[in-house]
Swiss-Prot record:
Organism: Bacillus anthracis
InterPro entries per record: CinA (IPR050101), CinA-like_C (IPR036653), CinA_C (IPR008136), CinA_KH (IPR041424), Competence-induced_CinA (IPR008135), MoaB/Mog-like_dom_sf (IPR036425), MoaB/Mog_dom (IPR001453)
HAMAP family: CinA_B (MF_00226_B)
Pfam families: CinA, CinA_KH, MoCF_biosynth
Protein name: Putative competence-damage inducible protein
């Protein structure tokens, strides 16, 4: 079954709020075998909403609406659909009682326009709103399925999970969609795609979809099958083929992120970490502390933005700063080694570079050095040549720090 999601609300068109409902619904619908081929956003206008309905009816089996179920005059979704389908709007007694009870409990006047929220399409299946007032509804008519949901995500999402998805399963074939995301770092999207292009072109089940984001690349493997075990086998076979070619850049699955993976390895190996941040200005340390229980492995950090701090706190020799510069391999080495000693950690990591937009020390923006000093191991400095905005260079530098830390921890 093919679906179209129609988000109703002028505030969406104006960019005042993001359409997170469409993302949530697309993912949920895909998981039960409903294909979403179109996303439409339309303002609070009866004529334009009617046009959107007519277009969607030509190309989709299921029309899913979010928004426009509230009490105000510009909440037109129910009225427009009722007119389009020649259906009456009737009061749902349970919803009306629930709304009335809310106003009594809060001591507010139950105005006539608020009763409007209890109106539903005659003959529709009503979805209770456990987190708001306006109920949702589903109606199967003229070979099409119409789903109406409230706009606020805090109301729509729990309604979907509790009531809408069980209703929708009546219209699916039983074939479900299963996905697995493979995460890679240290290789560009184009480089990775070249290495697996024949697999991307040749696969229909599962499919392979590459996506680049903030310096890393993901491959989403998606399989369709009625049986979860068979779907897992399909995905695993393709994953094995991919990792044979680019496994050296692979670091995790789905919602596993570099900083979490590095922290897990630190805990597993019983090692402690300290950081010296010039270029990144605390970004690395901030991401470290996003992980729960990290105090057992993270000693702390020094933000050494000014050369005085590099020299007098982290003891980078004056001649290094004068001759090689703060943005140099030598400076990164001293910073990593000395922050390790200063904070009595097993590992020291450092970041120095040029974030831009202007050059510094005759070095171009994106020139970065990441130092890594590990006890009983030779210090390593990783030179980077990054592109992007000032913020992107800083964020990608921190991510490269986690990547190199993770890879070194895997080796020792």
């Amino acid at each position: 079954m093919n679906a179209e999601i129609i988000a109703v609300g002028t505030e969406l068109l104006l960019g005042q709020i993001a359409n997170t409902n469409a993302q949530f619904l697309s993912e949920k619908l895909a998981s039960i075998g409903i294909n979403v081929y179109y996303h439409t956003v339309v303002g609070d206008n009866n004529k334009r909403l009617q046009q959107a309905i007519e277009v969607a009816e030509e190309r989709a089996d299921m029309l899913i609406f979010t928004g426009g179920l509230g009490p105000t005059k510009d909440d037109l979704t129910k009225e427009t659909i009722a007119s389009s389908l020649a259906e009456e709007l009737v009061y749902d007694e349970k919803a009306l009682a629930s709304i009335s009870d809310y106003f009594k409990r809060t001591g507010r006047e139950f105005t006539e326009n608020n009763k409007k929220q209890a109106l539903v399409l005659d003959g529709a299946t009503v979805f209770a709103n456990d987190h708001g007032m306006a109920p949702g509804m589903g109606l199967n008519k003229n070979g099409k399925v119409y789903i109406l949901l409230p706009g606020p995500p805090k109301e729509m999402k729990p309604m979907y999970v509790s009531y809408v998805e069980p209703f929708l399963r009546n219209f699916t074939t039983g074939e479900n969609i299963y996905s697995r995301v493979l995460r890679f770092f240290g290789i560009g999207e184009s480089q990775l795609e070249v290495k697996v292009q024949d697999l991307i072109d040749g696969q229909t089940n599962p499919t392979i979809a590459p996506l680049a984001n903030d310096g890393e690349v993901t491959l989403r493997l998606t399989a369709k099958h009625q049986n979860v075990d068979e779907a897992e086998k399909l995905i695993q076979h393709v994953e094995d083929l991919i990792l044979e070619r680019v496994g050296g850049f692979f670091y995790g699955y789905d919602q596993e992120f570099l900083h979490d993976k590095a922290i897990v390895l630190l805990k597993k190996k019983g090692l402690t970490l300290a950081c010296a941040e010039s270029l990144t200005g605390g970004l690395f340390g901030n991401q470290v502390t996003e992980s729960a229980g990290v105090s057992s492995v993270f000693k702390g950090g020094v933000i050494c933005y000014h050369n005085d701090v590099k020299q007098h706190v982290l003891h980078v020799p004056e001649e290094v700063l004068f001759t090689d510069g703060a943005v140099s391999k030598e400076c990164a080495r001293y910073l990593a080694e000395n922050v390790k000693e200063l904070l009595e950690a097993d590992i020291g990591i450092s970041f120095t570079g040029v974030a831009g937009p202007d050059a510094s020390e005759h070095k171009e923006p994106g020139t970065v050095f990441v130092g890594l000093a590990i006890k009983d191991e030779p210090t390593v400095v990783f030179p980077l040549n990054l592109s992007g905005s000032r913020q992107q260079i800083r964020e990608r530098s921190a991510k490269y720090g986690f990547y190199h830390l993770y890879k070194k921890l895997e080796e020792i």
